[in-house]
A protein has these predicted regions:
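Conserved N-terminal catalytic core of the sugar/cofactor nucleotidyltransferase
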Residues: 2, 10, 24, 28-110, ...
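The conserved beta1-alpha1 loop
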Residues: 5
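Short N-terminal binding/cap micro-motifs at the start of the first secondary-structure element
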Residues: 8-12, 146
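Short secondary-structure boundary/capping segments
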Residues: 13-14, 68, 99, 125-128, ...
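Short alpha-helical oligomerization interface
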Residues: 16-20
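Conserved core of the sugar-phosphate nucleotidyltransferase
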Residues: 61, 116-149
Length: 149
């Protein structure tokens, strides 16, 4: 699941008319970076929650997102908070609303963060899925531009 429902307040005025996951970095929308990273690890099913200007995201990505010749297309489904509730539900509410559409084991990642070096690997997912753990938090170092976090 990729979280993509937030208002993007710190990015205003850019997010006044564009949802933050569609802002481009290096010629690609922010949401495309985790989609490509997941596709590179063999994941072909992704649920995206939407909120602020949420209709823009399925309009841009559709239900099948092709990555060119590199990987198979990613099948996309959407949890449309803005459509059903009139607003985004915050992180926990968005996850709770999406649970019926998710598998018993799933990854949750931000869909509006530039992360070109996506740190997860399919082997990590498979190891977690085989474990008795209920959740796993993946900690990553603070980026050089924000060393205090």
């Amino acid at each position: 699941m990729l979280l993509a429902a937030g208002r993007g307040k710190r990015m205003r005025p850019l997010t006044n008319a564009t949802p933050k996951p569609l802002l481009e970095v290096h010629g690609k929308p922010l949401l495309e970076w985790p989609l490509r990273a997941l596709a590179a690890q063999g994941f072909t099913q992704v649920l995206v929650n939407t909120g602020w200007l949420g209709a823009h995201i399925p309009a841009r990505f559709g239900t099948s997102y092709a990555h060119g010749d590199a990987w198979p297309a990613t099948h996309l489904r959407y949890s449309r908070e803005e459509q059903d509730f009139g607003h985004a539900l915050e992180t926990a509410g968005g996850i709770a609303r999406a649970l019926p559409q998710l598998d018993a084991v799933f990854w949750l990642a931000a869909g509006d963060v530039y992360a070109p070096d996506f740190a997860f690997a399919r082997a990590d997912y498979d190891r977690f899925a085989a474990s008795p753990a209920l959740a796993h938090i993946w900690l990553v170092p603070n980026p050089p531009h924000n060393p205090a976090g």
